[in-house]
């Protein structure tokens, strides 16, 4: 950790406790700042708040008094708190510096940063890069929006490590000097407009990731969205990825992933399914190569990495049948991606909480569905949907029952896909619980030797 002195004796107001606010406050205190933590909820019984007070940090909960701005503090804001909160609006009017916690991770760390952002795929890309580091002699640690507070992890790495950080648009709005050595933008679509108000605002937040990069840094982005990158403000060396054509970067040709004419791996050897995941894989492989990770380590990762839990997660093979857990697919769009990810016949496990949705928009994506197993409140809707398309449909009481019932009708090379297109709350407390029940049922049906 660098002995950063830029905040020594400075007044700093941390707005929003949570995990990131707690770690930021502890770090700021260690750096010699005069720290106050503020949160809109009552913190009188909060364990983190009590711990901070025991360290001599002032904590104010239950309201956001405007008097907190009287000392003209630097503000470290929880990224989830919108700029429309009166305290933040007043800080903007006063011209106060407003940062997010990831800025602190950059200020104190000598480790080169791989920053990953984008509307879709950033968690998969970040996790896959992390897996490649684990299989390599080069060391890297995950941080950021993926669940590991960046300012805490930054204290644990050295100049010989990489800090692999998932970055949301909310976090990127609050950076000043933050500079990743390798920046990745997976894609940019319309999202979070309730927070950003306009698509331009959202896109500009994402572009913050490369604003401080120099010619010694790298930007990796989707070739087919290159028009969104503002070349006049870009100084980093730019590499592209594409699944459709040869580009200056990494691409797919003759079903191989290719970098600078070198074939790395065939598509059929990848564990992660789907065209969208192929784009994620290209971005991760390119970042790994630029970080000095060996091709062997990259291949080891690509042939074993099963994905993020409950997100089109490969959980194993029984005889010739691969099973995929996509329990996080709680809406039709996510299930469309899942159904489009396979060329093999699919046994599709579907259903859950009835929110009044119409599932007809799934019809164009059902061509590879051989059989459906419907359960939950939406069972009857999925029966009707399947029968309208001439699909074989059976019903089950729940996910576990569905896995049991398909054992007598499954055919060689069928893919078994849990992608409910519905929330889980009619039968399970969370989508994680539903996914874990699916995994246990798969394991229970494995042959014993």
Curated annotation (Swiss-Prot):
Residue sites binding ATP per the record: 118-124
UniProt entry keywords in alphabetical sequence: ATP-binding, Cell cycle, Cell division, Cell shape, Cell wall biogenesis/degradation, Cytoplasm, Ligase, Nucleotide-binding, Peptidoglycan synthesis
Pathway(s) where this gene product acts: Cell wall biogenesis; peptidoglycan biosynthesis
Cell compartments where the protein resides: Cytoplasm
Catalysed reactions, as listed in the record: UDP-N-acetyl-alpha-D-muramoyl-L-alanine + D-glutamate + ATP = UDP-N-acetyl-alpha-D-muramoyl-L-alanyl-D-glutamate + ADP + phosphate + H(+)
InterPro entries (alphabetical): Mur-like_cat_sf, Mur_ligase_C, Mur_ligase_C_dom_sf, Mur_ligase_cen, MurD
GO process terms (BP): cell division; cell wall organization; peptidoglycan biosynthetic process; regulation of cell shape
Single GO MF descriptor: UDP-N-acetylmuramoylalanine-D-glutamate ligase activity
Pfam families cross-referenced by the UniProt entry: Mur_ligase_C, Mur_ligase_M, MurD-like_N
Chief localisation class: cytoplasm
Function of the molecule: Cell wall formation. Catalyzes the addition of glutamate to the nucleotide precursor UDP-N-acetylmuramoyl-L-alanine (UMA).
HAMAP family assigned: MurD (MF_00639)
Record family assignment: Belongs to the MurCDEF family.
Designated name of the protein: UDP-N-acetylmuramoylalanine--D-glutamate ligase
Native source species: Staphylococcus saprophyticus subsp. saprophyticus (strain ATCC 15305 / DSM 20229 / NCIMB 8711 / NCTC 7292 / S-41)
């Amino acid at each position: 950790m660098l002995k950063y002195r830029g905040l020594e004796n400075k007044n700093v107001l941390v707005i929003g406790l949570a995990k990131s606010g707690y770690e930021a406050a502890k770090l700021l205190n260690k750096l010699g700042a005069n720290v106050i933590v503020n949160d809109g909820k009552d913190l009188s019984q909060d364990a983190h708040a009590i711990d901070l007070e025991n360290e001599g940090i002032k904590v104010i909960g239950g309201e956001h008094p405007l008097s907190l701005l009287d000392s003209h503090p630097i503000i470290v804001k929880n990224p989830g708190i919108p700029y429309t909160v009166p305290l933040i609006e007043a800080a903007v009017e006063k011209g106060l510096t407003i940062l997010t916690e990831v800025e602190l991770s950059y200020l104190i760390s000598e480790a080169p940063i791989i920053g990953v952002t984008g509307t879709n795929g950033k968690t998969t890309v970040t996790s896959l890069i992390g897996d490649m580091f684990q299989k390599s002699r080069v060391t890297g640690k995950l941080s950021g929006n993926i669940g590991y507070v960046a300012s805490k992890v930054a204290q644990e790495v050295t100049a010989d490590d990489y800090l692999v950080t998932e970055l949301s648009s909310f976090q990127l709005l609050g950076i000043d000097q933050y500079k990743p050595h390798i920046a990745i933008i997976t894609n940019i679509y319309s999202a979070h407009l309730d927070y950003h108000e306009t698509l331009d605002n959202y896109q500009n937040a994402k572009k913050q990731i490369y604003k401080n990069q120099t010619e010694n840094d790298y930007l990796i982005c989707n070739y087919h969205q290159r028009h969104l990158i503002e070349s006049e403000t870009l100084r980093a060396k730019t590499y592209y990825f594409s699944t459709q054509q040869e580009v200056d970067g990494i691409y797919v040709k003759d079903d191989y992933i290719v970098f600078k004419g070198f074939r790395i791996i065939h598509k059929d050897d990848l564990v992660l399914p789907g065209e969208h995941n192929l784009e994620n894989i290209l971005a991760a492989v390119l970042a790994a190569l630029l970080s000095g990770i060996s091709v062997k380590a990259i291949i080891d990762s690509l042939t074993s990495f099963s994905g993020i839990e409950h997100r089109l997660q490969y959980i194993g093979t029984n005889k010739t049948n691969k099973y995929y857990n996509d329990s996080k697919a709680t809406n039709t769009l996510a299930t469309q991606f899942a159904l489009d990810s396979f060329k093999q016949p699919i046994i599709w496990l579907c259903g859950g909480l009835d929110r009044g949705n119409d599932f007809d928009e799934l019809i164009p994506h059902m061509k590879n569905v051989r059989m459906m197993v419907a359960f939950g409140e939406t069972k009857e809707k999925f029966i009707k949907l399947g029968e309208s398309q001439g699909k074989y449909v059976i019903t089950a009481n729940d996910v576990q029952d569905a896995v049991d019932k398909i054992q007598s009708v499954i055919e060689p090379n069928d893919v078994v896909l849990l992608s409910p297109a519905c929330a889980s709350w009619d039968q399970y407390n969370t989508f994680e619980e539903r996914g874990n029940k699916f995994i246990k049922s798969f394991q229970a049906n494995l042959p014993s030797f």
